[in-house]
Amino acid sequence: KEGYLVELGTGCKYECFKLGDNDYCLRECKAKYGKGAGGYCYAFGCWCTHLYEQAVVWPLKNKTCK
C-alpha cells in the first residue's frame, strides 16, 4: 500500500516543497509507518510507500483539511 502521509488531527497532508527524493518525507514516513516504509515528495505532499494494508493515509473519511 502507498499514499499521502496525513495529519490525523486536521485531515491535512504533510506538505513538502522539494519534489522527488526528500529527507523530511522519508523521515516522517518511517516515523509513522515503521523503518520498512519509504517516502518522497510528490505534488507537494509527502507520499509514503511500502505501507502495511491497514495504514491510514489521506484522505480521511469525515475529515477535510481546512
From Swiss-Prot:
SMART domains given in the database record: Knot1
Record-level GO cellular component terms: extracellular region
Molecular-function annotations in GO: sodium channel inhibitor activity; toxin activity
LCN-type CS-alpha/beta domain span: 1-66
InterPro entries: LCN-type_CS_alpha_beta_dom, Scorpion_toxin-like, Scorpion_toxin-like_sf, Scorpion_toxinL, Scorpion_toxinL/defensin
Described function: Beta toxins bind voltage-independently at site-4 of sodium channels (Nav) and shift the voltage of activation toward more negative potentials thereby affecting sodium channel activation and promoting spontaneous and repetitive firing. Acts on human sodium channel Nav1.6/SCN8A. Also able to weakly shift the activation curves of human Nav1.2/SCN2A and Nav1.4/SCN4A.
Additional notes on this entry: Is neutralized by the single-chain antibody variable fragment 10FG2. Abundance in venom is approximately 6.2%.
Family membership noted in the UniProt record: Belongs to the long (4 C-C) scorpion toxin superfamily. Sodium channel inhibitor family. Beta subfamily.
UniProt protein name: Beta-toxin Chui4
